[in-house]
Amino acid sequence: MKASELTAKSVEELNAELLGLLREQFNLRMQHATGQLTQTHQLKIVRRNIARVKTIITSKAGA
């Protein structure tokens, strides 16, 4: 997910994207805790995508 793709979206779309990412992060954390997650780098990727979305939401709210 690129920041340029996110800036084109509205705040409502970004909030929906954020909700989906948070759910994905929760599922990955549960899989990691139970030992089912083999691709642990996905946790890092999702965490950074959440940060990207939150940053864009904050910048749009300030504008």
From Swiss-Prot:
It comes from the Bacteria. GO terms for biological process: translation. GO terms for cellular component: cytosolic large ribosomal subunit. Keywords: Ribonucleoprotein, Ribosomal protein. Disulfide bonds: none annotated. GO terms for molecular function: structural constituent of ribosome. Belongs to the universal ribosomal protein uL29 family. This is Large ribosomal subunit protein uL29. It comes from Shewanella pealeana (strain ATCC 700345 / ANG-SQ1). The lineage of its organism: Bacteria, Pseudomonadati, Pseudomonadota, Gammaproteobacteria, Alteromonadales. The gene is rpmC.
